[in-house]
């Protein structure tokens, strides 16, 4: 059995991790659990560097927890775009990948620059409740063609590259 700890209690993130690891390890029994840990950065990171730091900090917070893999997903902004960093730790090695980016409407960006969080802004713009734990801004802006979990799934597999090719890393 592989134990995977996710540095979040957000179901969208936990489901993305479970889905990606099930694809990578189709014959393994997986125990995927989320644990809320602090990021050490702003609730709404405003740059790629700050977002990556938040993911790295979350994985570091999980170091005290027994697991085969420790995973953090930190969403943030980079200019007019939102995206997320994936950081995976396994036996002291790190894998990282950045998700696809999506443009945000100018009305949303102006509210984010005033200190609001993207999930709250999207809830208000689209008359939703807690979208960040469902399909996310991605689902709303793609008219549900993609979801937060589906976009994170791909990036998580990319973050696993060092572990899938250990002789190269």
Where is each model-derived feature located?
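N-terminal polybasic phosphate/anion-binding patch
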Residues: 1-67
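Anionic-ligand binding patches
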Residues: 43-169
């Amino acid at each position: 059995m592989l134990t995977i700890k996710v540095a979040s209690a957000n179901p969208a993130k936990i489901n993305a991790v479970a889905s990606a690891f099930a694809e990578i390890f189709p014959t393994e029994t997986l125990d995927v659990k989320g644990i809320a840990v602090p990021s050490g950065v702003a609730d709404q990171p405003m740059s790629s560097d700050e977002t990556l730091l938040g993911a790295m900090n979350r994985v570091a917070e999980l170091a005290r927890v027994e697991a085969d893999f420790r995973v953090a997903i930190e969403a943030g902004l980079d200019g007019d775009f939102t995206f997320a960093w994936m950081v995976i730790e396994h036996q002291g090695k790190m894998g990282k990948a950045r998700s696809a980016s999506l443009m945000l409407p100018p009305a949303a960006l102006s509210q984010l620059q005033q200190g609001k969080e993207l999930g709250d802004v999207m809830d208000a713009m689209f008359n939703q409740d807690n979208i960040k734990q469902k399909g996310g801004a991605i689902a709303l802006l793609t008219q549900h063609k993609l979801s937060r979990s589906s976009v994170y799934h791909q990036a998580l597999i990319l973050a696993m590259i060092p572990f899938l090719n250990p002789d190269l890393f």
